[in-house]
Amino acid sequence: GGHLVVIDSAEKWTRVAQLADESGLTYVWIGLYRADSGELAWVKDNVDPVYNWAAGEPSVRDTNGAAENYVLIARRSDGWYYNDCIGDPAAKYPQFYGGKTGYIIEIDP
């Protein structure tokens, strides 16, 4: 089986950022989400995570007040950063996310 990528080491963060750069995308979904408790959780248990949040993130809600329950990495001028996000940003903000969003799947051994 597989799941959205879990970033649990500096080496994996570097590799994910490299893959994201090579993809030509601006946004890439990762395996981090907001659980029912309101806390952020990874799709895989027992993770020692590496975080690289954008300034002001996680913000929990978008500018219109919608809950941001999922996390993607976003390309900025100086690199890739975590950003919490609504579930389907391309539908709500196609000018920013349309055709620019992908994901990285990690296959379990």
What are these regions (language model features)?
Residues 1-109:
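Extracellular, disulfide-bonded carbohydrate-recognition/adhesion ectodomains
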